Amino acid sequence: MSADNSSGERYLALPRGRTLAYEAVGNTSSKTVFLYLHGSFAIGDASKASPMLLRKNIHFIMPTLPGWGNTSPPPPSTSYNDCLTSDMTTLLSHHYPDSKGHDIKLYIAGSSFGTVPTQILYGAPYDKFPFGRCIAGVLLMGAFSPFRYHKDYAKCMTWSSYIVIGPVGYYMPFNLMGRLVKFVLTRKGTTIEDAETSLRENLFDRMDQAERETFERWCEERGRALGETERGMAENLVKSVSKSWVGFMLMSPVLHSDWGFRPDELDEEHSRPHVLITASKDDHSTPPAYAHYLAANYKNVRIKYVDGGHMSLLYYLNEVWAEFLADEQ
């Protein structure tokens, strides 16, 4: 057993002069791999990996997605799907050069926007993502549905989501809405303090009293001072756009794009892994209706509901990890 519980960003050289940033902790020689894909305005950060995960003899890998942080954007004329599957194949092949996509046990997970690349990997053709044959489980936390096929996706959106990533933003030419949002956000400031203020206004200050008390208990149980979580998220937010805003600018096009498959048409082999979807009952960013659509169209799937809004999944993570990895000792 080769345990490495010290996090720190690492860099993998990719073809065409690109770079993939990632962090990894746990048993680096384990053939059980947990690949976690982050959401928007974030990076691959394993510094707060759950001790419960580390006790399960798992190699925990958190890459930074294309166009965010220190990971290069997709090359010109390369689709997001092809870039993602190529990057993740290179990353896993780097750690498991002799596996040829056959002899590891792979769990893939994502939260919020990270559920989109997670689903792309889940349904990807095996010639594009050979490690797809190794997938044992898929975890989608605060999931997005594929807007291309979920015709009612916009009905449960907030006005801000409807404008930025919904029909308004998507159908405006030249990604003008994304450019406008980027302009507004950069005008508000790009320091850690600016990001922390924005996070408080848009996430933490919108908690009701019950969720605020749950959050405070969660911090206390983990020995975190009040404000520490917000500060950490703000630091990663700033890092995520420190090199470019390409990751953000790709969000709306990717949400509306062809992910390479229809959820209701996945073949039997792709549908083999169990899929766990978690949905927060009062989440307005990724409404439960998205989880309902996915559950109705994927096979071998189950939904786990939790109380609270978009942030509330944070408080149930250990419970979710344990349920998702119940077969791992």
Task: Briefly describe each language-model feature range.
Residues Y153-D264:
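Alpha/beta-hydrolase
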Residues L53-P74:
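Conserved alpha/beta-hydrolase
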Residues K105-D152:
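Conserved hydrolase catalytic core segment
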Residues H292-Q329:
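Catalytic active-site module of serine/aspartate enzymes centered on a nucleophile-bearing elbow/loop
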Residues H270-S271, L276-A279, D283:
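Short beta-strand/loop motif that positions the catalytic acidic residue
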Residues G39-M52, P73-P74:
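The serine-hydrolase catalytic nucleophile loop
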Residues F248, H284-Y290:
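Conserved alpha/beta-hydrolase "acid-adjacent" motif
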Residues C83-L106, I120:
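Conserved acidic catalytic loop of the alpha/beta-hydrolase fold
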